[in-house]
Structures are given as C-alpha cells and as structure tokens.
C-alpha cells in the first residue's frame, strides 16, 4: 500500500513520514533524492551550469545559489524543475519496484508538490497534513523562509482547501508529538497495517 503526504509548507510532512517509519513503513524522501541528484545527475548539473550562473561549486549544485533563481520562476527554472521531477519519478519507480520484491506492507511518499506533480497517482491513499497558523509560522521561521519565497511557493501549489478535498485522511500537527503519533497509529490501524 502506498500513502502520499500533502499539505501546505511548514506543516510537518517530513515529521509525519518519520512517524510512519515507527510502524514499519518505508519512506520515499524526495528532498533527499533531489539532494543526491544535485550531486551526481549529469543532465541536471549541466542544465544548471548553463542556465544558472554560479550555481555549481565543486561539480555539484549549490542549493543556496540555486534558490535565488527559484525566485525568478522563469522558463529556465520551469525546465529545470521538469528535469528534476522526471529524475525523481524514475527513482520513485525503482523504489516501488524494489519494495514490491520484499513485500513491505506500507510505503510513504514524502514528496513536495505531491498533487501538483501528479505523484499522487502512485498512491492508494492521501493524507492531508495541517497545522494552526502559529505552529506553521514558527516552522517557517526556523527554516528561514521569508514572505517573498512563501508567496511564490504558495502560488505554485494547489489551494489548501483543494488538497484537503483530495485526501482520504487528515492529521493535525499543531498538537503534541504524542497526539500526532496517535493520529498516525489510528490511520495505520484503520488500514489494518499494524503488525
């Protein structure tokens, strides 16, 4: 069974993915995959080198420099994003195939823009994760995401209401870690996945 996580930025999707690990889930962490691709994928590195001056350091993509180009969100960035999404999708398909061989009960996709990139089509269920505005603001502050970047990210995402409507379950991460874990356990139990 494959579960995808969705929600706004700074709501705790990666934390929820880690909670699922406690119940034996394998997690596909797209951010980790992208970090690896920025180090080794020759097509992605070459494209960045040609289109984003200064974004390559020691043969790898420098995420800090690259993030400045994100704010332009021009055709070069959209093409770059398409290359990255395609490479991540290839890695996801390998991950799913390998996991089928060992017959694991649960895979969790921690993929930013899960719905927008259509990665949700791999999922049996989708969980909408949310937090109250105070908790979300605190997390965004900890990640040094300023208003300009937040506004751009929000503009390329589906509206939160639509994400919620497309989801099968919801988890509120505004509460204690224990309560969040109990919400994850309730979902695992409802899907008869507990061991």
UniProtKB/Swiss-Prot annotation:
Enzyme Commission number(s) from the entry: 2.7.1.24
Cellular compartments annotated: Cytoplasm
UniProt cross-references to CDD domains, sorted A to Z: DPCK (cd02022)
Any one Gene Ontology cellular component term annotated for this protein: cytoplasm
Transmembrane portions of the chain: none
Main location: cytoplasm
Pathway where this protein functions: Cofactor biosynthesis; coenzyme A biosynthesis; CoA from (R)-pantothenate: step 5/5
Catalytic activity: 3'-dephospho-CoA + ATP = ADP + CoA + H(+)
Pfam families with a match to the protein in the record: CoaE (PF01121)
Role description: Catalyzes the phosphorylation of the 3'-hydroxyl group of dephosphocoenzyme A to form coenzyme A.
Similarity comment: family membership: Belongs to the CoaE family.
Name of the molecule in the record: Dephospho-CoA kinase
Gene: coaE
């Amino acid at each position: 069974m494959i579960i995808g996580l969705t929600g706004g930025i700074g709501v705790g999707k990666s934390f929820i993915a880690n909670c699922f690990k406690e119940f034996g889930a394998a997690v596909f962490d797209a951010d980790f995959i992208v970090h690896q691709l920025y180090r080794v994928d020759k097509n992605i590195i070459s494209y960045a080198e040609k289109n984003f001056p200064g974004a390559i350091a020691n043969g790898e993509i420098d995420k800090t420099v690259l993030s400045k180009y994100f704010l332009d969100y021009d055709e070069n960035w959209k093409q770059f994003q398409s290359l990255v999404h395609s490479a991540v999708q290839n890695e996801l398909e390998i991950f799913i195939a390998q996991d089928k061989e060992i017959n694991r009960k649960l895979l969790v996709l921690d993929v930013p823009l899960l719905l927008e990139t259509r990665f949700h089509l791999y999922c049996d269920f989708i969980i909408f994760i949310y937090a109250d505005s105070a908790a979300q603001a605190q997390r965004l502050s900890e990640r040094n995401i300023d208003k300009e970047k937040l506004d751009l990210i929000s503009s390329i995402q589906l509206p939160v209401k639509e994400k919620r409507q497309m989801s099968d379950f919801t988890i509120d991460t505004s509460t204690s870690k224990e309560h969040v874990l109990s919400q994850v356990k309730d979902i695992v139990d409802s899907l008869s996945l507990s061991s």
